[in-house]
């Protein structure tokens, strides 16, 4: 049995320990974890510096996601406190009813068991995942990217030390420190120990996990996110929404990557949005129609339309009408978040009913696809599949159903 299998075995052994903890204890531990992160912020920053010094090939936005300082650590700690304040996802009241023979059936909410997370260079995910799985009564196995290994080690050690202080087995939270592909391949196939696997990262990485895992997977989305500006759009509002969705945090999955513009307003609107986005440092690529309107737009390749840039790059297409926009989006979407900027109720209704995505917006930045913004608290990821969970996954997505039956000797005739 190799090291990853041992981690899986140990996680399975402690599932009942965390599942049976009273919610008051779970909440106090989360608060203590929050305090421990704040108290050890200098050690965390020092470890993070080692990661940053080694991460010479990362793009600017990806490097920003990796960086930890006192302020970001304070924000991560605050998210732990926020999770502690959320309602217990395991609490009742539970639905119950009686069978015709008289026995009682209770439909109970229970933890999934062992949750494995594979993610890239985002050390905040280490803490978010640990907090949400712990609050929902699960054990967690974390496997972060090599770019954040030093940060992940110290963060998990701090959280595990808090568990020890509460006389709990630290294996409730475990980190795989082997950053080779071998550890990923092993984790993908730990069906005996892992109940569900949640990958977060690029579309290519998530596709690899989905195609190669024998463990059940909740597919979280790459975000090839579109904004369609309809002919009825308020143009100043559209510019504000597009600017925010593209430039605020370009490396995240809910950032906008593609812009579709109705041809009736393209001549007027395109130069305005080009002015705005170029001033923000965005590289603009587009189809022939877009380039004929504004020569500052460079040519887009066929690959551009299916690429999640995670950077200050955006591709622009001019469309004939609402129907073409919807068809184009459904052909190229990653089923994450899609937006229409429009005042035409019929067009909005068609867009909402027909676009196949977890979240569909009217006149709102896609940057709001987020557990906190949706009122769920921190999120474990954004699911782009339709089974078990879809969209921002909060605490309830980390639970399942168990039926408890109480009777008095009934037998089936």
Curated annotation (Swiss-Prot):
GO terms for molecular function: glutamate-5-semialdehyde dehydrogenase activity; NADP binding. CDD domains: ALDH_F18-19_ProA-GPR. Catalyzes the NADPH-dependent reduction of L-glutamate 5-phosphate into L-glutamate 5-semialdehyde and phosphate. The product spontaneously undergoes cyclization to form 1-pyrroline-5-carboxylate. Its EC number is 1.2.1.41. It catalyses: L-glutamate 5-semialdehyde + phosphate + NADP(+) = L-glutamyl 5-phosphate + NADPH + H(+). Pfam families: Aldedh. Pathway: Amino-acid biosynthesis; L-proline biosynthesis; L-glutamate 5-semialdehyde from L-glutamate: step 2/2. The keyword Amino-acid biosynthesis applies. PANTHER family: DELTA-1-PYRROLINE-5-CARBOXYLATE SYNTHASE, GLUTAMATE SEMIALDEHYDE DEHYDROGENASE. This is Gamma-glutamyl phosphate reductase.
